[in-house]
Amino acid sequence: MGLAELRELIEPEETDLRALAGREIAIDAFNALYQFLTTIMKDGRPLMDSRGRITSHLNGLLYRTVNLVEEGIKPVYVFDGEPPDLKRETLERRRERKEEAMEKLRRAKTKEEREKYARQVARLDESLVEDAKRLLDLMGIPWVQAPSEGEAQCAYMARCGDVWATGSQDYDSLLFGSPRLVRNITIVGKRKHPHTGEIIEVKPEIMRLEDVLDQLGLESREQLVDLAILLGTDYNPDGVPGIGPKRALQLIRKYGSLDELKDTDIWPKIERHLPVEPEKLRRLFLEPEVTDDYELDWDEPDEEGLVEFLVEERDFSEDRVRRAVERLKEALQELRKGGRQETLDAFF
């Protein structure tokens, strides 16, 4: 929702993982784990161990993280905390959609139908989150617990210069002020399109906040947030019905802000569809709850701990796990030996 509707007006920069070498990337953990749950499947169902516990998230997190480090990227995963109260409606809608999809999954007769609805019912519960944190600890990969929205924490770390960019599929990172957003960082490669079934090549994309503002003809992040509010955000999911992307952009360009629209004929319609005053919605993006309580250290992986967790407890192949650990050790050594590989992007 929101900025995603402006996709046709925004031109991201297509790149590859090698171009991100030497960069610290704060990855939206919930976003990445949900991708793993919905794409790493067998016969339309997530991977499971012999006790029926889901392992797709562990599979994706292990091998994708190793791949990123091998490309010279320093990932740090950021986990969501308590969502703001205004997000409850969005979360309730998601819950209802999952219940509807669950009923369709029960009636599914083909593999394609099972895969489709299995993706829609995937849930990231507390046990899966704790699994992921335990795995990252054993891998020596840092993670951060956000007090509220994970993307807000990622953006804060990027603004502070502790990481170079946010890694997420969602455009909200830009609303939270991340100077750079890297999309598709955890799903690079050939993938089956979730709706058409077509095999497509997925490549990383970089979106710079300054470039997005320039392409949209906006002067500030505050204007970008007001634009998103008109289109709909997680805190006002319906936006303002009847005001599409182009009309919303025209209004913000012409009047400068939602506040300046209060004396126009269109304001009663806008006000009717906002759950609270615009300033309260703005503050969720411009002044989100974040923390400085984090340390970014990439440590030596605990090979035997990983074997105990993944092989003995979760039925992974010992040979594959040990090979992954060896790859991770070698990649981390290369990072320490080579240091930060500056690119021209560092100067912009």
Swiss-Prot record:
PROSITE patterns: XPG_1 (PS00841). Transmembrane segments: none annotated. Pfam families: XPG_I, XPG_N. Mg(2+) 1 binds at residues 28, 80, 149, 151. Binds 2 magnesium ions per subunit. They probably participate in the reaction catalyzed by the enzyme. May bind an additional third magnesium ion after substrate binding. One of its GO terms (molecular function) is DNA binding. It comes from the Archaea. Keywords: DNA damage, DNA repair, DNA replication, Endonuclease, Exonuclease, Hydrolase, Magnesium, Metal-binding, Nuclease. Its EC number is 3.1.-.-. Residues 113-256 are annotated as: I-domain. Signal peptide: none annotated. Its cofactor is Mg(2+). Residues 340-348 are annotated as: Interaction with PCNA. One of its GO terms (biological process) is DNA replication, removal of RNA primer. SMART domains: HhH2, XPGI, XPGN. Residues 1-98 are annotated as: N-domain. Structure-specific nuclease with 5'-flap endonuclease and 5'-3' exonuclease activities involved in DNA replication and repair. During DNA replication, cleaves the 5'-overhanging flap structure that is generated by displacement synthesis when DNA polymerase encounters the 5'-end of a downstream Okazaki fragment. Binds the unpaired 3'-DNA end and kinks the DNA to facilitate 5' cleavage specificity. Cleaves one nucleotide into the double-stranded DNA from the junction in flap DNA, leaving a nick for ligation. Also involved in the base excision repair (BER) pathway. NCBIfam families: fen_arch. Belongs to the XPG/RAD2 endonuclease family. FEN1 subfamily. Interacts with PCNA. PCNA stimulates the nuclease activity without altering cleavage specificity. This is Flap endonuclease 1. It comes from Methanopyrus kandleri (strain AV19 / DSM 6324 / JCM 9639 / NBRC 100938). The gene is fen.
